[in-house]
Amino acid sequence: MNKSFLLIQKLSKSFRDGNEKITVLKNINFSFEDIKIVSLTGPSGSGKSTLLHLLALLDNPDSGKIIFNNKDLVKSEDEEKTDLRKNDIAIVYQNNNLISDLSAIENIALANLNKNKDKKKSYLLAEKLLKEFGLENRMNHYPYQMSGGEQQRVAIARAIINDPKLLFADEPTGNLDRKNTDIILNYLFKLKKNNRLIIIATHNRDLAKKTDLRLTLSNGNVINKS
């Protein structure tokens, strides 16, 4: 695989708190020579979520490059970034962000409808994913009718319906008990495949130990790779 599949160069990000400038990420550099499942660890406030948001093109860095398939995404136009989020990039949040008045199958299919506009195909894909995630009996359930673990499985299914090459997960098990955490981790690791990179921000040490690469952040810097 091309070594520049995903390459991060001198990525920095800061925020304003009144008159104070708070630097969250400082000249982050790393690359992926193989498709991996990667964990981002570190204390709260170390920059994990900020880094994922930058990589998912949900925010812009102050400086630096995000090179994907030999192209610097930071310089991409907004329309191109939107297309990338539809086709190649997906993110799963701790709070799942499901649409409350849509059923499980509708939440998942909507992500694909935004891409191909073929309603029948989108719903067939969503149904297939629900079965793969053990949710065939929850297809027409709304988020409030499902457990936290079930909601998170729906969120992951929604994220992968367009077969993204980059999948980011921001504390995907942070609100779950041990049983549901194990279920979600099992599904995330099943998503490892050729031409897909999965990066998971987590405080879960057991999860981090199972990933191919562990990056530890502290005070906006990568302080350890293992």
Label each region the model flagged:
Residues 167-170:
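Catalytic Walker B motif of ABC-type/P-loop ATPase nucleotide-binding domains
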